[in-house]
Amino acid sequence: MLPGLLGRHAHGLYRADRCSAVCLDPVSLLSEIAPEPILKSIARGRMVVTDLEVITITPTSAVIAWTTRQSRLGVGVPQPVTAGTELALGPVNGPLRTVHDDPTPRAFHMVEVTGLEPGRRYRFKATSDGQQAHAALLPTLQVGSCEQINEFTTLTPPPGEYLTTIALTNDIHIGEKRQGIVLGSLPTSVQPHPDQVDYPQLMLSASLDDLTTRRGHPFVVVNGDITYANLPDEVELARQLLDGYGEQDADWVATRGNHDHPRRDDDPFGDVFVGYQRNQTILDPSGVRVLAMDSTRGSGGGWIVPDQYDQIMSELESDPHRPTLAVTHHPVTNEAAWTSISGPQFMLRASDRLRLQLLENQAPGVFLHVAGHTHRMRRDRADLLWAHTQYLENAACAAYPGGFSLLHLYTGGYLLNFWRPSDPDAHDWLYRSRWQVMGLGAHLMLG
């Protein structure tokens, strides 16, 4: 038993209410490896320094990003403008100190500052060539957001002993050729540049590489939509990339998403990963259980069939108090269903949403349920007023917001943070994919 794990809320989620130090040494500068934009010969015009985001806050670090570009004309991807990267940071009641000043011209700017103090409030100023970066996305424009007040508070670790870290990633879409809602010739999706056509592979590879080299090689839950259409070559490539990270069930587990649903005559995903509507249970050496369920039905919404309910109930009833991370590709709350731009028909059917929440409520150990599918980062409200389980939608890997989350577990609670990979090519693609759905998509994906 791991007492106290259920007693703390999630911290550090990527959304506007995450704002809550200066010990500035050492400083790790992700912008040193950030990309120069793909379009290198650009008329400067009027530079806009925008899309300011406090991406990640931990007890001892923060990641801040922004872009430089021309003013947007029409509905296409705006021209990037290259500029330098400067970040000043200091205690909220003290002077700002320059922690990074890199004149290398680039359009996507990202700086990670480490060596901060837990539970301390900092202020910052991000600039490029003397112009201050400003927020542009709806969640970052909320009153009191980190980006509006240019302040953040580092997190305080939960009490108790550190147990383990689990990485969460989803919506990879290997085999996909355009990002966004594809509606014929309408500009609702983003066409990758010729050297970005394999962007799903790029984003997964970059994430797995960061997890190996920068984040301690944690166990990874790859939570659905791993392929675009469950084609044999897509499944084979996905398996190859994951096998490069480690062994199935020992280093990673893969669930099925709606894009991975069985085809009419075959099921390549089932042949290589796991059969249709099969529950998977992973016991971490720390004692934490991962309950990986299959919520898929067809190409959109989802369900849970009776046989899988039997598997789920048998597992939970065998040890109801064991600390358990539950995952499905589809979100399982009504709030998620009714706030998604795709609507409730794109979600798990209503009866299954309620039944899963009831089952999890009967098992005191289920402290968190993580889903993907919507491509956004969002905490959801449980439908049961007395629920002890918390619910989270994790952002997509394949495109903007683009990355993975780390769930750090302690005996007294947990921390959860979103991270973007550090690969320069990944940054190039994030700059471009931010403009999916005619630029509206990014406003809907950050909480």
Where are these regions (language model features)?
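Active-site-proximal beta-strand elements of phosphoester/diester hydrolases
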Residues: 163-176, 287-297, 325-329, 390-396, ...
